[in-house]
Swiss-Prot record:
Record GO terms (molecular function): zinc ion binding
Pfam families in UniProt: Herpes_UL31 (PF02718)
Segments forming CCCH-type zinc fingers: 70-184
Protein name (Swiss-Prot/TrEMBL): Nuclear egress protein 1
Species, as recorded: Saimiriine herpesvirus 2 (strain 11) (SaHV-2)
Gene encoding the protein: NEC1
Keywords: Host membrane, Host nucleus, Membrane, Metal-binding, Phosphoprotein, Zinc, Zinc-finger
PTM entry text: Phosphorylated at serine residues in the N-terminus. This phosphorylation regulates the localization within the inner nuclear membrane.
Compartments it resides in: Host nucleus inner membrane
Length: 261
């Protein structure tokens, strides 16, 4: 037997048993989004067109959406789209509205919490929805700054949302309800939430004629944040809860009881 054939078999055998690492979509897109030159090289080598739009189903775990994509929900179907091919994403960037990536304060959960936690009038709906359960829930929210962060980021993205709170596994969860027939969540908003809230499961569903984005804590992150809790609680207790706002809270709670979140 020739040495060449033996060498060939050894080479084939070594290739057959080479340990390959399974590359997930999330790992791949995270790599090319952080290293632009890698993404450019990959695009040059592609011999098949990019799928710019994908059909998605509700309920949807937002962690399943790859970086670079937005989501569009409507009565006629739901899709995940590449940002550069989405008219609404392009429009937001051109107008400078709804693109939260331009607001550098939003990159920090702690900074957003510090700057907004005492603005009880500005975030009246957030605090009165908490207070509708109990003062204890209001105080508990101070230990979960991610709740206020999620609310502020989605509002900054240009959405009119109403917050509903519920308890799960001794932690507070927040459900942001959107009263609209069609809903577009931009890529920058999705990335901001997913990158800065790794300890929360974020999902979206259609519940009782409203779209609902739910944030549920998976594990706690220790944050050393010192605030004037008593002063904030006193300010919240003096807020006027209108009949309209009270009705919003009741409707939201009833909707969540129908859907097992």
């Amino acid at each position: 037997m020739s040495s060449r054939s033996v060498k060939s078999r050894k080479s084939t055998k070594s290739r057959r048993h080479h340990p390959y690492v399974k590359l997930t979509d999330k790992m791949f897109f995270s790599a090319i989004s952080s290293k632009k030159e890698l993404g450019t090289d990959f695009l040059r080598e592609m011999d098949a067109p990019i799928c710019t739009s994908k059909t998605i189903l509700l309920p949807l775990d937002l962690n399943s959406i790859s970086p670079g994509r937005c989501i569009y929900l409507s009565p006629f179907g739901h899709s995940s789209n590449m940002e550069f091919q989405c008219e609404k994403c392009t429009e937001s960037k051109n107008k400078g509205s709804g693109d939260v990536s331009q607001n550098h304060d939003l990159y920090s959960v702690t900074l957003v919490f510090y700057k907004n936690v005492d603005k009880v009038v500005k975030h009246k709906a957030f605090y009165l929805s908490l207070l509708s359960h109990s003062m204890e829930n209001l105080k508990k929210s101070f230990t979960q700054p991610e709740l206020l962060y999620a609310y502020v980021v989605v509002k900054e993205a240009g959405h009119n949302v109403f917050p509903i709170f519920f308890e799960k596994d001794d932690c507070l969860s927040i459900c942001l309800t959107f009263k609209c027939q069609t809903l577009h969540i931009g890529e920058s908003c999705l990335r901001m939430l997913m990158d800065n809230l790794p300890n929360y499961k974020i999902s979206i569903d259609y519940i009782k004629d409203v779209y609902a984005m739910t944030f549920t804590q998976c594990f706690a992150i220790q944050r050393n944040i010192s605030i004037a809790e008593d002063t904030i609680c006193e300010s919240v207790s003096t807020l006027d809860c209108t009949d309209e706002l009270r009705e919003e809270i009741v409707k939201g709670i009833n909707a969540l009881q129908i859907k097992d979140i």
